[in-house]
Curated annotation (Swiss-Prot):
Signal peptide: none annotated. Keywords: Cell projection, Cilium, Cilium biogenesis/degradation, Coiled coil, Cytoplasm, Flagellum. GO terms for biological process: cilium movement; determination of digestive tract left/right asymmetry; heart looping; inner dynein arm assembly; outer dynein arm assembly. One of its GO terms (molecular function) is protein homodimerization activity. Dynein-attachment factor required for cilia motility. Homodimer. Belongs to the DNAAF19/PR46b family. It is found in: Cytoplasm; Cell projection, Cilium, Flagellum. GO terms for cellular component: motile cilium; outer dynein arm. This is Dynein axonemal assembly factor 19.
Amino acid sequence: MEKNDVINFKALEKELQAALAADEKYKRENAAKLRAVEQRVPSYEEFRGIVLASHLKPLEQKDKMGGKRFVPWNCHTTRERTSQDVVTEIPQEKSPFQPTTSAEFYRDWRRHLRSGPERYQALLQLGGPKLGHLFQMDVGFGLLGELLVALAEHARLSDRTAVLGILHSLANTGRFNLNLSLLSHAERESCQRLFQKLQAMSTTRPMQEGLTVEEPSAGLQGEEGLLQELLELYGVH
């Protein structure tokens, strides 16, 4: 086996542990969200606080007693790494964004897709039908706002049909109205800005296709009907 072909099992184990932790975080936050809804919390701030604190556990009796704790010093943990400890790492290419569950989407969206353009292209790559299938039960806490921000910042005229399809699929996901009501002020502004962009494209696109605004094609008429429906679903006026 060539030196560059040595597999870094420690890195693979670390990646697996991170994936399991992300899945657990997704389930924990959704459970906290349901509890907050059942408790009828009076404000978004309190709702958000409950979800963000979902990882905290009540203190056990032994933790409340106080007192100093002494940890034995382990000389073996401070030794220098030898040549046997060093494993040649294989350069890992960025894998395509192909989540098969909402938990995988949530994990990879937060871990690998950091920039706005990357997130926008990932949404276009998946498309409305795939997103609708992934989130048929519910969009994770805070995720709807992030999706709308990515679309608002990078939507282009050539992608208008695809963006409308994505918005339509998201509007048909579980608990959509609840997630919509929990958008932050900045996310609501992004949503408003996105629909303003889409409306502005209504006059730009016919001109590029050699049509008049008064006589759009049948396809454009269908898109305009969908846009009006989405304006109502997203509460944009």
